[in-house]
Amino acid sequence: MEPLSHRGLPRLSWIDTLYSNFSYGTDEYDGEGNEEQKGPPEGSETMPYIDESPTMSPQLSARSQGGGDGVSPTPPEGLAPGVEAGKGLEMRKLVLSGFLASEEIYINQLEALLLPMKPLKATATTSQPVLTIQQIETIFYKIQDIYEIHKEFYDNLCPKVQQWDSQVTMGHLFQKLASQLGVYKAFVDNYKVALETAEKCSQSNNQFQKISEELKVKGPKDSKDSHTSVTMEALLYKPIDRVTRSTLVLHDLLKHTPVDHPDYPLLQDALRISQNFLSSINEDIDPRRTAVTTPKGETRQLVKDGFLVEVSESSRKLRHVFLFTDVLLCAKLKKTSAGKHQQYDCKWYIPLADLVFPSPEESEASPQVHPFPDHELEDMKMKISALKSEIQKEKANKGQSRAIERLKKKMFENEFLLLLNSPTIPFRIHNRNGKSYLFLLSSDYERSEWREAIQKLQKKDLQAFVLSSVELQVLTGSCFKLRTVHNIPVTSNKDDDESPGLYGFLHVIVHSAKGFKQSANLYCTLEVDSFGYFVSKAKTRVFRDTAEPKWDEEFEIELEGSQSLRILCYEKCYDKTKVNKDNNEIVDKIMGKGQIQLDPQTVETKNWHTDVIEMNGIKVEFSMKFTSRDMSLKRTPSKKQTGVFGVKISVVTKRERSKVPYIVRQCVEEVEKRGIEEVGIYRISGVATDIQALKAVFDANNKDILLMLSDMDINAIAGTLKLYFRELPEPLLTDRLYPAFMEGIALSDPAAKENCMMHLLRSLPDPNLITFLFLLEHLKRVAEKEPINKMSLHNLATVFGPTLLRPSEVESKAHLTSAADIWSHDVMAQVQVLLYYLQHPPISFAELKRNTLYFSTDV
């Protein structure tokens, strides 16, 4: 199931909140960071993580948002007659093909749900029934009707898509599908009872419990997986999910359908019916979001919930935090034995009337948080990527489902640890009657959302109170039913048919902003989701004393399964009394924030795409383009052999009559002169426009190079050096030797590894070898300053390894099948190769060439 928040569908939160009194496998997370982690149980299917962006607010409706991300009650405009009609119709085909594939999966899921119904009915009239006729009719209510509706729809749509031409019409099929939504209304009304009945029957009948825990869903026709095991509980949820997906497709189809096309009015009508249906469902469901009453007798409602990392007793714990209309409650999911209803355990609560945010001065006095070592976080990411690759290989080779489940469990455990240990941005709250609490977040956007939601509620006339033990028990008990976020935000919780996100490089130019009421010192930061959570990736310069900043700064952001881009606009604080000594304590004022989805169809083009994000009356203009991982593997030789970028290193050194290219020597010299103590040197991106300017100067062999280098930001110089190595026609350690490096680093015997790795260095062409040894010694000198610059040998190997050593384009095509694989394939080994040489005693070019075998006394 794809993330839904960005589509602006009316009141989407109903999908998550709908009768949420059932459990999912990954809800059995261990809230205590120091206890053994639990992954999803075998055979269970988990709901995907739902983004908590503002468009997912329980109070959101299409009419209340007034533009922005919300969708107006009227359908989106189609293509004007004759305007890019051919392109639009081709997009229609792509949209329909994707929907048809997911429709096939849905029909297979319904078939799997219906499969046990007939034998259960057959036993119902015997002396030993598994279920009664009444129980069967309750659990499987309307499933047969829904199956027949969608089977007919699929059978009619499939030939139209397979035999596609520009004149094909299918609007009448969607119109008919929408007209049958009454069946779904009946299903939804019965849904809660169906789940309760299924749960009771599972507890009282072992035979039915076995059936309901492992239903076999047939894989799609083209899939190598013949069957997957899914729980009945998860399958009963599928029809609810399907209504929303069908409505999303109608939006997409209308967007790419010419207004004068015969399908256009039919699709409009289908969308109108679907939206009315969703609205009516929301009206029915909203009352179920209520919990107990407030001290003033008003209904207490859940406003926001989500998973946050709390620092408690000097260790990190994953908590589920619930914000009600008058209280903030921090809870942990209790561990329960199989078959028992899951419950939350309240760790603490603060009435909003007593909740205050500490000032920067007060925060400074509180205990500071020591970040988790970067190299350990990188190791976790490498393990996760390697496990993803293994899972893909197992699936491709039709591996055993148990083996795949074991790998998935390992991946979940590593993702959980990464989620627990990576956040560093403090979010401090204080109970004016006592204790303070500290959460760590990875995103300032998310911290701002929590703060704003609390402050908005605090504007009301709130009263202080103390909950009795019974009241607290009732409130905590309601959390399981009311929660809107069911799973911790890790990628292993995604459905197989859900978009894996984008892997590659996103180039973003932040142009300008307007709409500020007065002049200020302004800058922007960019966040993207990575490994299931958001992280800050780039920051513009501060534009001083202006109401209309024009940054025009370009950034290259690496995407790792990313689906969203966030832009935050800040006013810089120069008042020393307000500046916190904790580097992670951002005290600058957020002026606005916004988020867009990284739609593959929009960004996966070679051209720049310009857009505007609106935030609190502020408009930020930016452009972006995306380069996929497989495209970034391609090294394009320079057309003009007079430059240095994209030109063979042997050609450059011969032309310059040097052993190491001039660009490498100059960049290294400048970094060692004034950047060796720069925090995050080589890891933090330089401004892309500065890097491109330096590239042009080096390519032109301009006489002003040295002057320009001395004035340029040091991160731009470091970025230029990395870009030079990345744009070599082949990697510095060569395509030819790549497989041998991979085999050498995998050797177990230290002596054999030593001889192999040194022999491989000797096999490099002289310009490559001398340049590599020169770079090696430089990186070692950078790592000597690790206490100051925070760049260890491991960090530097992570940055440079995949640049100096990567598979050739031919090998990539031969072995890799997906973007995620391209990212993860051999990355760990590439890092380990460079790390091996960085940790090795100094390597002499002369000694390497003198010895046919290289022996080390350390082995």
From Swiss-Prot:
Residues 301-459 form the PH domain. Its main location: other. The modification Phosphoserine is found at residue 57. Pfam families: C2 (PF00168), PH_19 (PF19057), RhoGAP (PF00620), RhoGEF (PF00621). The keyword Flavoprotein does not apply. InterPro entries: Abr/Bcr, ABR_PH, C2_dom, C2_domain_sf, DBL_dom_sf, DH_dom, GDS_CDC24_CS, PH-like_dom_sf. Residues 54-64 have a biased composition (Polar residues). GO terms for cellular component: axon; cytosol; dendritic spine; glutamatergic synapse; membrane; Schaffer collateral - CA1 synapse. Residues 484-613 form the C2 domain. Residues 91-284 form the DH domain. Keywords: Cell projection, GTPase activation, Guanine-nucleotide releasing factor, Phosphoprotein, Synapse. SUPFAM superfamilies: C2 domain (Calcium/lipid-binding domain, CaLB), DBL homology domain (DH-domain), GTPase activation domain, GAP, PH domain-like. Residues 26-84 are annotated as: Disordered. Residues 647-845 form the Rho-GAP domain. GO terms for molecular function: GTPase activator activity; guanyl-nucleotide exchange factor activity. SMART domains: C2 (SM00239), PH (SM00233), RhoGAP (SM00324), RhoGEF (SM00325). GO terms for biological process: activation of GTPase activity; modulation of chemical synaptic transmission; regulation of small GTPase mediated signal transduction; small GTPase-mediated signal transduction. Highly enriched in the brain. Much weaker expression in heart, lung and muscle. It is found in: Cell projection, Dendritic spine; Cell projection, Axon; Synapse. Gene3D superfamilies: C2 domain, Dbl homology (DH) domain, Pleckstrin-homology domain (PH domain)/Phosphotyrosine-binding domain (PTB), Rho GTPase activation protein. Changing residue 859 to A: Abolishes interaction with DLG4. No effect on synaptic localization. Protein with a unique structure having two opposing regulatory activities toward small GTP-binding proteins. The C-terminus is a GTPase-activating protein domain which stimulates GTP hydrolysis by RAC1, RAC2 and CDC42. Accelerates the intrinsic rate of GTP hydrolysis of RAC1 or CDC42, leading to down-regulation of the active GTP-bound form. The central Dbl homology (DH) domain functions as a guanine nucleotide exchange factor (GEF) that modulates the GTPases CDC42, RHOA and RAC1. Promotes the conversion of CDC42, RHOA and RAC1 from the GDP-bound to the GTP-bound form. The central Dbl homology (DH) domain functions as a guanine nucleotide exchange factor (GEF) that modulates the GTPases CDC42, RHOA and RAC1. Promotes the conversion of CDC42, RHOA and RAC1 from the GDP-bound to the GTP-bound form. The C-terminus is a Rho-GAP domain which stimulates GTP hydrolysis by RAC1, RAC2 and CDC42. The protein has a unique structure having two opposing regulatory activities toward small GTP-binding proteins. Interacts with DLG4. This is Active breakpoint cluster region-related protein.
